[in-house]
Amino acid sequence: MLSTFEDILERDGRLVYTNVGTSMMPLLRERRDLMVIEKKGPERLHWLDVPLFKRDNGQYVLHRVMWVRKSDYVICGDNQWYLERGITDKHILGVLTQVDRDGKVLDMRSPKMRLYGLLEWLSYPLRACWLIGRSVPGAVVRRVKRYKMRHHAAA
């Protein structure tokens, strides 16, 4: 029987895993870096923490806390522009505490990695403009192609 992330965190107190996806690049390289995620305690998350959470649709996500609000968190991937709101403590399973990369250990609580998180946070407005700007031309091209296909098919 396969164990869920929740089962592993409950049993062992931590989860060691590789990531799938590019939303946390360059911090996490897809299928290359090992993540150590520790089970979340009763305390609230802190600004710039990187929690593992489970969306209401069952999808597991690891993104950075951009803002801590009274009843929820605003979370975003380091390589994303979309701010996800409404993530509450009930969604949070654990927090990224360590990244093992090419034999080097990156402690997420170290001053160096906290500074890295701060720089990611500060760069968010520029990153959002860049990523949105890159996606708009592609979306326009796709719409034009669909429009042409519909009108050629009708002719």
What spans do the regions from the language model cover?
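Extended hydrophobic leader/signal-anchor segments used for secretion and membrane insertion
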Residues: M1-A155
